[in-house]
Swiss-Prot record:
Protein name: NF-kappa-B inhibitor-interacting Ras-like protein 1
Interactions with NFKBIA and NFKBIB as annotated region, ranges: 58-93
Family note: Belongs to the small GTPase superfamily. Ras family. KappaB-Ras subfamily.
Record bears the keyword Aminoacyl-tRNA synthetase: no
Region Disordered, residue ranges: 168-192
NCBIfam families noted in UniProt: small_GTP (TIGR00231)
GO CC annotation, single: cytosol
Gene, per the UniProt record: Nkiras1
Source organism (scientific name): Mus musculus (Mouse)
Protein function: Atypical Ras-like protein that acts as a potent regulator of NF-kappa-B activity by preventing the degradation of NF-kappa-B inhibitor beta (NFKBIB) by most signals, explaining why NFKBIB is more resistant to degradation. May act by blocking phosphorylation of NFKBIB and mediating cytoplasmic retention of p65/RELA NF-kappa-B subunit. It is unclear whether it acts as a GTPase. Both GTP- and GDP-bound forms block phosphorylation of NFKBIB.
Amino acid sequence: MGKGCKVVICGLLSVGKTAILEQLLYGNHTIGMEDCETLEDVYMASVETDRGVKEQLHLYDTRGLQKGVELPKHYFSFADGFVLVYSVNNLESFQRVELLKKEIDKFKDKKEVAIVVLGNKLDLSEQRQVDADVAQQWARSEKVKLWEVTVTDRRTLIEPFTLLASKLSQPQSKSSFPLPGRKNKGNSNPEN
């Protein structure tokens, strides 16, 4: 099992961040349950990666962002990964995800943080405000993976978190710098 990675779940108020986590982890979220505002909760999950290794995730369920309110900066300093959540029936929530991605890029080097995007409330697609093709095109241009999901179908939630855990548990790449006390490969003559 890995060291434990910190993943921040963020998005506008009422896009379903807590519902996603409760359905993913416990399989017991009730649709239509009265919304109660989250201050911040931390969930622990052991997620199997695509390599069969279990990765421990600390999932930070953040307070829903409101208009004009930014994600607190301390999240950028400790997060190993982000799950950006919008609602397919709320264009403003998608626009906020676009801004969050820019903020993450500004505060973290893209190469060291894993990001997945979830378009939630797919079951409300008749009220859709976010075009699926436009969202996927944006995700490709930002080099992030985007899924449209619904808490009514827990299976739609598993793949994004499996991919995230897999990205977070990838083995470190080997350094190209020679280590002290070792000879450089391919250079048997130190005089050259």
